Amino acid sequence: MIAQGEVVIENLDVRQARDGKHHSALIRAATDINVNDGVLDIQLKAIAGKPILNAIVVRKKHVVANNWQLVWGDEFEQDGAPDTSKWNYDLWPAKKVNGEDQTYTSRAKNVRVENGKLILEAHKEQHAGAEYTSARLNSRGKGDFLYGRAEIRAKIPAGQGTWSAIWMLPSDPYKYSTSCAENEDWQGSETCDAWPNSGEIDIMEHVGFDMQNIHGTVHNKAYYWQNWQQRKSSIEGKNIDQQFHRYAVEWSPETITIFFDDSPYFFYSNEATGWKAWPFDHPYHVILNLAIGGMWGRAGGPIDDSIFPVKMEIDYVRVYEKQHKNNIEKI
């Protein structure tokens, strides 16, 4: 894709879906295009296949509002283990969710604060019945919020088989569940519909076989990947494994917008049709994890064991609310 005489997207190839078997629709965003004469010139060339272009949307450059007030976060200033007043460990076996190949641990080898950064580090090793180890943290019950802005500055790893994620789940996953009790282990359960019913917001997902692309997504009962009605978008991110970038979401009762370095590329609106399309009306919490393999991580081929160890680095996590509101909730 060429805009104003410059290549802004080199490849618009439709990638495989998470199951690695099917193709999905494609929404891509290009940023930092300067128009000086009031006319935007765009050129598209089909290299292979017969693509269908449904729409082109042009938006003004986003300027982050100055009325956000910091209400929760972690700057990772103290070396050692993560602050357990802010974070919980998810200690899970391999294959619990998404077919992921790693086991999540709380060992310093896999998760630690070091030189002002949170480190999530994956290793190729046999441990607890798995062939790989890594880490996953969540802020449930310690940093839950309803509406606002969450911003995370991070550097994510390269390598075939990596699956990095910065995302959010409901702090009450059973709010819209119809098939399971509150004491049931709902994540990874095939009989509990807490997911997708109660929602999910993916601020950033990245898989190593699709190195240049960052993905933002929401999941709910009406729109999620298993019913082929996914709501997602992607943006090209250069040097994402070499430099830190900002990943953010702004969430209100009407809209969800996801950003890469303050460039908005995913937009989702409340259709006012009920909880199936908008379960995003109750507190959520932040999740940080580095998965290995799984349905999406393996979609581009086998895990490359030569890449290990690999690490995801987080500089900070910050949650803001509008100054005239009081929507932060501690559960």
Tell me the role of every PLM-derived stretch.
Residues M1-V64:
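Compositionally biased, intrinsically disordered or flexible polar/acidic segments
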Residues V63-I331:
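GH16 jelly-roll
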